[in-house]
Amino acid sequence: MTRDLEYNITAQDNGVTISDYLKKQGFSHAVTVQLKKIPESILLNGKWEYMGTSLNGGDCLFIHFEETESSENIVATNLPLSICYEDEDILVVNKPADMPIHPSMNNYDNTLANAVCHYYQTQGIPYTFRCVNRLDRDTTGLTILAKHLISSAILNSEVSVRGISREYLAIVKGFTEDEGTVNAPIGRKEGSTIERQIDVLHGETAITHYKRLAYQDGLSLISLKLETGRTHQIRVHMKSIGHPLIGDFLYNPDFTKINRQALHSYRLRFTHPVTKKPLVFTAPLPEDMQALFPEMIL
């Protein structure tokens, strides 16, 4: 997979080196190392230059990047793939339930990575799988995939400064407050490699905002926005205030209404890693959650 990028340098970057300018654009150290291995990957006003060369207003910086290898140890598998958006830099997918993001010992060929690698293999395009916002196996909805190392680096830097806004929909037990915020650190539960818990002493900062959208038959449909992205954050936080997600095999194993955790990645807002245009994507409630609130159209 190849990508050519062009940057028109303004006066405010007079004297800035190419290396520092690329860092400012979100290029990681791994990207710059890779660029050094590619012939004529960095052209300034049509001529090859070193990373330490200084820029001037009016300069044209051209970046050529290419990846010729695909992800190792990921079997290309023909699985359903719901693509919401695709361009040269990113892929936005609406992930179904019962699909892990990455392969593991017990999930060798049934993951999103397998499906996406098959999608590009059939087109003859080398592709390395890079997921920006990971979802649990049974969480449905939107996830962003980077199509090359540059977009991956830029998007991950946005994640680190909370530049990607994520909104979820969940169905929880009981009648919640109209809205609220859970600010409670999360850490691993002792004796478990999977389960998390509120851990005031050793946990990492975690903040979740929620708002009730509807109530029916002892269940609340809520929207949630995250300030942080801890493992199982929504599931642990909602349980901690007495409103666990229904169908959650770890934190509330009650499958009378639904056979998986009722959690859906509903909306993503972020800046495109290359064009810098604002992007917004939404994915409607999946059928199993919609069936519990049939009158709610989101």
Enumerate the predicted regions with their spans.
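RNA pseudouridine synthases
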Residues: 1-181, 288-295
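Pseudouridine synthases involved in rRNA/tRNA modification
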Residues: 1-31, 35-36, 81, 201, ...
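Short, surface-exposed secondary-structure edge patches
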Residues: 50-54, 223, 260
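A short beta-turn/loop motif at secondary-structure boundaries
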Residues: 133-137, 202, 214-216
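Short, conserved beta-turn/loop elements at beta-strand boundaries and strand-helix junctions
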Residues: 177-178, 191, 215-218, 231, ...
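Short aromatic-glycine motifs in intrinsically disordered, low-complexity regions
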Residues: 193-201
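Short proline/glycine- and basic residue-enriched helix-capping loop/turn segments at helix->loop/beta transitions
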Residues: 205-207
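Long C-terminal interaction/binding lobes of large macromolecular proteins
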Residues: 210
